[in-house]
Regions:
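Membrane-interfacial amphipathic/re-entrant helices at transmembrane-helix boundaries
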Residues: 1-49, 78, 87-93, 318, ...
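Cytosolic-side transmembrane-helix boundaries in multi-pass membrane proteins
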Residues: 1-25, 195-197, 202-209, 278-328
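Generic structural signal for small/hydrophobic residues in well-ordered secondary structure
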Residues: 41, 65, 78, 105, ...
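Transmembrane alpha-helical segments in multi-pass inner-membrane proteins
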Residues: 69, 94-95, 212-299
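Alpha-helical transmembrane segments within multi-pass membrane transporters and channels
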Residues: 86-129, 266-267
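Single transmembrane alpha-helix segments in multi-pass membrane proteins
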Residues: 26, 30, 34-86, 110-120, ...
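Extracellular/periplasmic helix-loop junction at the C-terminal end of a transmembrane helix
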Residues: 127-160, 166, 187, 234, ...
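Helix-loop-helix "hairpin" substructures at the membrane interface of multi-pass membrane proteins
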Residues: 159-237
Length: 328
């Protein structure tokens, strides 16, 4: 479960080990000196941040949004438009990506949170498709279905390894902030809303205000991920805002485990790796991916991280029970 544990000492050690494992893995990726690994790790970091931003809404607050791609795309187009039109340098354009993502969430959020459950989900989908339609048809400004190509970035970022370490630093800082938010009293209220919004409201907490805040924060981090994507690929298109992109990040979160903080990051890595590997060998890669995803969902019902934690916990419990029986 996301949030503080009942055993502070064990929880702190567990969190430290998680951070060390994640940082060590991504720090060692460039040692292979293969562009494939660096490119894949960059994709995982960006999509992992996007998935973790979404999970603040779904896994923490209990709000299933199909409109997350709107904020992701808004961040990407913010960077792309500002740089291609020569308005601002990259050092200013990238920080504006989360601002625009948050602003869009602040604009759409009050309308969406009036509803709950599947109605909230459908409303977020409708607004996201509206944003996508505007971007897709506005050729004079957004490039329409052609998107924006040749986004200029500082020359130092032309080397994939340099941009990788830059992305790693930004994502680590963003994830640390997300962690603090989840473990704060504010995060505890969000989890209370997920468990029982009526009871939370009965306690005098303005549920809609907290839900809107969660949407804005999630939109900001989604926008940041979109800005990083634009700088990495140096091109963007309207598919960034399509509902299928929201569906992809939902699948990543569920696959990795919505109850685990790092679960969405793991889910992003699994899905991107499977897509790349299978896509090299067959033109019917979507069918294979669908079958693999179905098997993973069946055998890992709580997500990869959640199921592994459950197995480890059961094994530890059996060992403790065995020791207690042997030494009464």
């Amino acid at each position: 479960m996301i949030g503080p544990s009942a055993a502070p000492g064990n929880a702190a050690r567990g969190q430290l080990l998680q951070w060390v494992a994640v940082l060590l893995f991504f720090a060692l990726v460039p040692l292979g000196r293969r562009s494939f690994f660096i490119t894949m790790a960059n994709e995982v970091l960006i999509m992992g941040l996007f998935a973790m931003a979404f999970n603040l809404l779904y896994g923490v607050t209990g709000m299933l949004s199909f409109g997350q791609a709107a904020y992701y795309g808004a961040g990407g187009y913010t960077v792309g438009l500002l740089l291609t039109k020569g308005v601002l340098p990259y050092s200013v354009a990238l920080p504006l990506a989360p601002v625009v993502g948050a602003a869009l969430a602040l604009l759409l959020g009050p309308l969406c949170i009036r509803l709950s459950g599947v109605y909230f989900t459908m409303l977020t989908l409708a607004f996201a498709e509206l944003v996508w339609g505007v971007v897709f048809k506005w050729y004079g400004f957004t490039g329409g279905d052609n998107g924006i190509q040749g986004i200029p970035v500082p020359e130092w970022f032309h080397h994939p390894l340099h941009y990788y370490y830059f992305t790693l630093a930004i994502v680590v800082a963003a994830v640390a902030v997300l962690r603090r938010i989840v473990e704060s009293p504010f995060g505890a209220v969000l989890q209370s809303i997920r468990e029982n919004p009526e009871r939370t409201a009965f306690l005098g907490i303005r549920v809609r205000r907290y839900q809107l805040a969660a949407m804005v924060i999630s939109g900001a981090f989604s926008g940041l991920a979109g800005g990083l994507f634009a700088g990495f690929h140096r091109s963007i298109g309207p598919d960034m805002l399509h509902w299928t992109k929201s569906g992809e990040v939902i699948l990543m979160s569920i696959l990795g485990g919505v109850s685990s903080f790092f679960g969405p990051l793991v889910g992003a890595g699994v899905i991107l790796f499977i897509e790349d590997m299978i896509g090299k060998y067959t033109e019917f890669w979507e069918i294979w991916i669908g079958g693999i995803m179905l098997a993973i969902v069946v055998f890992f019902p709580r997500g990869v991280i959640g199921t592994l934690y459950q197995w480890t916990h059961r094994k530890g419990s059996r060992e403790r029970d065995g020791n207690a029986t042997a030494h009464p």
